[in-house]
């Protein structure tokens, strides 16, 4: 099953309405912290935009992501704040809410691919978004300042080429400003407007 045409219509309207992103405020359970390296952040919040392009579809919308070591809350919204997709993971279970329906699976990647048809490397995104690499990644070029310019990530289906198109200072650390992730069947762009390292509040 694929995402309904209504979701893609909302997303395409969003492209026409895109405005500069406003500041994201950490959720009430977390406090912002400063780090010297993004790897030091055990949890973070991101506000930005994501665009997915395949041979069949084009999709672009706002992105909010609360990432923790064992849990995630990822939301796609219109510029007016309407949520069109929510993906949550916790304790080995993934839940996807879209088009008024809820789907569950033990594997978030399989769930998203099965429902949306998008082949997105979810497991690797938290690393790439913060300028880090995984065990399947090979850096092929650097920028003059030492930040990563491009890497290749091995995947059984087809390798991913990840281009870091800009870097910025956020929460005291250097993190990518714009990522382009592509292989022959899909192109993904993620723009980070604000990245905040956070820590759970002491109760």
Swiss-Prot record:
Q: Name one GO biological process term.
A: protein transport
Q: How does it sit in the membrane?
A: Lipid-anchor
Q: Does the keyword Membrane apply?
A: yes
Q: Which keywords label this protein?
A: Cell outer membrane, Chaperone, Lipoprotein, Membrane, Palmitate, Protein transport, Signal, Transport
Q: Which InterPro entries match?
A: LolA/LolB/LppX, OM_lipoprot_LolB
Lipid attachment locations (S-diacylglycerol cysteine): 22
Cellular location(s): Cell outer membrane
Q: Which family does it belong to?
A: Belongs to the LolB family.
**Known role:** Plays a critical role in the incorporation of lipoproteins in the outer membrane after they are released by the LolA protein.
Q: What is this protein called?
A: Outer-membrane lipoprotein LolB
